[in-house]
Amino acid sequence: MEAMLPLFEPKGRVLLVDGHHLAYRTFFALKGLTTSRGEPVQAVYGFAKSLLKALKEDGYKAVFVVFDAKAPSFRHEAYEAYKAGRAPTPEDFPRQLALIKELVDLLGFTRLEVPGYEADDVLATLAKKAEKEGYEVRILTADRDLYQLVSDRVAVLHPEGHLITPEWLWEKYGLRPEQWVDFRALVGDPSDNLPGVKGIGEKTALKLLKEWGSLENLLKNLDRVKPENVREKIKAHLEDLRLSLELSRVRTDLPLEVDLAQGREPDREGLRAFLERLEFGSLLHEFGLLEAPAPLEEAPWPPPEGAFVGFVLSRPEPMWAELKALAACRDGRVHRAADPLAGLKDLKEVRGLLAKDLAVLASREGLDLVPGDDPMLLAYLLDPSNTTPEGVARRYGGEWTEDAAHRALLSERLHRNLLKRLEGEEKLLWLYHEVEKPLSRVLAHMEATGVRLDVAYLQALSLELAEEIRRLEEEVFRLAGHPFNLNSRDQLERVLFDELRLPALGKTQKTGKRSTSAAVLEALREAHPIVEKILQHRELTKLKNTYVDPLPSLVHPRTGRLHTRFNQTATATGRLSSSDPNLQNIPVRTPLGQRIRRAFVAEAGWALVALDYSQIELRVLAHLSGDENLIRVFQEGKDIHTQTASWMFGVPPEAVDPLMRRAAKTVNFGVLYGMSAHRLSQELAIPYEEAVAFIERYFQSFPKVRAWIEKTLEEGRKRGYVETLFGRRRYVPDLNARVKSVREAAERMAFNMPVQGTAADLMKLAMVKLFPRLREMGARMLLQVHDELLLEAPQARAEEVAALAKEAMEKAYPLAVPLEVEVGMGEDWLSAKG
């Protein structure tokens, strides 16, 4: 076993930890960190990391961790408004504080809380006691109040790593430690509601103390203090100044009975269980609780069937990567392939982290290697924030290294540990075995197959766009009255707001400069003709630089096709995403976006078949909510937007005009994403009150939709997560947040995820069921983008393939409403979409 950190080596140094302050600081610094059960743990993790950082730098004879007691301190009795301005304690904090105290006890540290006194006073008393007994002292805190304690033997250790010593204090502020409390009394402290002297800031306070040496001497010579306005401020606030001085000075004389030389051994097993419970896998190693890796038991290649595989690629994209190393592990025995590529021929299945990638590379080499168990997929189902092998290894106990054998061992261990965590989770296990694992085989085949690209067409389109971009630039320069760099936001800002005097509608968060974002320009579209031209220029430039020019270079020289990567563990809802290139971001509705789709073509003698789920999210909403009106519309095959408009506006369906239908369509989809009345009023260019009425009439038309949303949010608050029809989860801890904007954002996420995630699950199910039948027919599955599937089939069988695929998608899973799929065929993606 690796030894624990040398916490108690007799080096004559004591560590005092400002527990409450450190916990609060890390609570806000790492907000959003939760376990796979949705339990917030950011303060616990940050506290542990800060402790480790301090302990690694120096050995300590003893460690004391001090917390504020629940009872009010003497300062509250002296000054009723003390700390009155502080925000209420965040609701997640008390539970995490209890966990931090549990951690401190397990580490064997002395934990102190003294009723009637703050942690500062306890720390100060301990520091003076330790100093008097001949110890060196480090106080781990970022609280500036404790700077008054620094001396030759006492230093404040900031969590970021630097020491506050008398020398540091003099260099930074020109103050001696005994002057620090006078300085704090003069300037006050808004965080503690200490008044200080109103109108005196740090610069003036430092100048006064430099001149008079101390607050006591300054007050003795108050009539000689210059300038006059400073003197008058002090006189006007003398009572506040004396109160601030009294409250700022820490007590060093508390009657504490502690033995500085006493130290307890940590509870190793309890600590291990604690860290595993909170999924702090990386901390097991840092606290020395992982068994030292035993020498690997080597065995000859090939490995036995069922072994877990580890591999190392030269780059992330498997179609372009070199296989640098290959190893396998079964029951702790390691098998290394001397020749990685040759070793692939001995495998039938890839079990291990990122199994799909190795299957894709094998396919490139002409080998049919099937991806099997992948701990990444298990971790992703436990918590969709598990998106990388590095993160999964850290979270569940392990390390992602560049060694293929260790990756194989890690895969075996993670698979075992994650299956144990999923015991009893029948829905998640069903998703793993019936959806995600078989889907990885489908995606591996799709990635390896790729799609043909019309490179000559894209090159011609690039020239055309370059000319159009040049023409737009000239038009913008003419309207501006002079040329400038259109790609420089600062120059564009000057032209729009200084020269053309357009209204500045917002500022950037980082710099505070007037924003030239797309949202701002959209709002200014009607204000001046130049804005329309700039927006057009941006769209053309972005699509040219993102797709038209780079796509030809991504065509693989060996296959002559484009091979995007499908990311199975990247989104919070369960949807697939794509990268290298990202095909999800090609605009579907703009003319230029459609022209880019024209570049994706079928092989000679083949046809592309495009299949698109029609209004799948609204159909899923009908099923999940059980709303009879919504269900009836889809069962009777009526147009949902026309029917919604009919109910919203109180007119027969035949009387619904295009504007009414557009309003209803916006509300139908807006409800899914929690669109506010304010946003709806902007979208439809209608008064706010009318938008409120639209939304209310929608919920009157579909009453069970509102009931379902409320039920989903209520369950989410209780359980900490929401789930799809099939049990896929998303943890939403902020559903209980006190801050309204944070809570409302979480609510939008919470009721959208079951709909969007169920739609994603249905698409995945359809792909898994359809894939083997397509292979039997000699057809290929190429792309999955949004709610669409793109296939390639021999022309002679294209109609047969289209009919088969349509049926498979529509019958993916029985719902209360029929699923409907729109089908098209053509020589390229655009014409196949019709």
Curated annotation (Swiss-Prot):
It holds the Pfam family Taq-exonuc. Keywords: DNA damage, DNA repair, DNA replication, DNA-binding, DNA-directed DNA polymerase, Exonuclease, Hydrolase, Nuclease, Nucleotidyltransferase, Transferase. Residues 412-834 are annotated as: Polymerase. It catalyses: DNA(n) + a 2'-deoxyribonucleoside 5'-triphosphate = DNA(n+1) + diphosphate. The keyword DNA repair applies. Residues 176-262 form the 5'-3' exonuclease domain. One of its GO terms (biological process) is double-strand break repair. One of its GO terms (molecular function) is DNA-directed DNA polymerase activity. Its EC number is 2.7.7.7. The keyword Transmembrane does not apply. InterPro entries: 5-3_exonucl_a-hlix_arch_N, 5-3_exonuclease, 5-3_exonuclease_C_sf, DNA-dir_DNA_pol_A_CS, DNA-dir_DNA_pol_A_palm_dom, DNA/RNA_pol_sf, DNA_polI_H3TH, DNA_polymerase_1. PROSITE patterns: DNA_POLYMERASE_A (PS00447). In addition to polymerase activity, this DNA polymerase exhibits 5'-3' exonuclease activity. Belongs to the DNA polymerase type-A family. This is DNA polymerase I, thermostable. It comes from Thermus thermophilus (strain ATCC 27634 / DSM 579 / HB8). The gene is polA.
